[in-house]
Amino acid sequence: MTVAPLSTAFRSLVGLGGVFTSAKSFEDNPVLSSRWLNQAGLHAARVTWAHRVAVSRRARLAHLVSAEDRAAFARDGYILKRDFVPDFAALLAEVRSYRTAAREMIQGDTLTRKIALDRAALAAMPALRTLVESEAWRNLLAYIGGMTARPVQFIQTIATHINNSDPDPQTYFHADTFHPAMKAWLFLNDIAGDVPPFTFVPGSHRLTPARLEWERQQALIAAQARDEHTRQGSFRIDAAALAAMRLPEPAQFRVKANTLIVADTFGFHARGPSAAPAMRVEIWAYGRRAPFFPAPPRLPWPFGADSYRPRAAVSAFDPA
């Protein structure tokens, strides 16, 4: 046997193992991208199985949130809380004055900066530590994420129009992956003017027959898609496809500082439009676990370290 067949066989074995994990890249996995397997229902089966598990997980954690919040999430795919932090002024002052190492990434014309909420950061910012250790914060994130394990948490800065490159790819409506996942945003500045709002299609987190068929069709062509994010399993969607699924108009959240949004990012979402340079700063959390097991193990940090560059002694509110 030559080297090439051995390599192909090894990739197929690895790809087969990925079927039972959170693996989502059609470009990198010959099993997930197999047209024959997806015509036979592989992708649709993974999506369906993952959603059944997510429903079960959330049912076990339903006591953590109010009936009103559960109903809002079931209807919309997100929970919104205004004036969330009681002593918001203290938290904001801490974040503004805190300087440390950060990681930055540029996608298109937009910069994303992340400051890790590690032990040192939380020790230096007691009001922020109080927030992320509070039941109000943890319970909402746990319920939508379907897990009580602590999510990945950062101070995140979004700076728009920092160059003359292509548009930010996050401004296109998309689902993060094939299974339910949680993201949270506590906005530290008002989302107004040219500050890009979080945008979400209400109800698009639900696995309807129309959505499942759309997922099946996307899986047949994803590996050859022009869009790299689609090839990597974060499917993009246009207005015509949203309308075909009879989904409502997207909601743009132009909200005041101290507003929390926790959402299931299987739902279609995007970073809203920004016509001029602007900055958005938020406490950002991301929860993702292996989608097929009732007690999911922790997954590695999903974003490639090579896409970020280090930056020393920076504040979340510093310019790009």
Where are these regions (language model features)?
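Short, cationic low-complexity segments
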Residues: 203-214, 304-320
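Non-heme Fe(II)/2-oxoglutarate
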Residues: 67-133, 163-165, 215, 221-222
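Catalytic core of Fe(II)/2-oxoglutarate
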Residues: 232-311
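Fe(II)/2-oxoglutarate
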Residues: 1-75
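Short helix/loop capping segments that flank catalytic or ligand/cofactor-binding pockets
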Residues: 182, 195-196, 208-210, 264, ...
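Conserved double-stranded beta-helix
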Residues: 114-122, 136-207
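Double-stranded beta-helix
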Residues: 195-262
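Short, solvent-exposed loop/turn segments at secondary-structure junctions
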Residues: 85-88, 159, 178, 191-193, ...
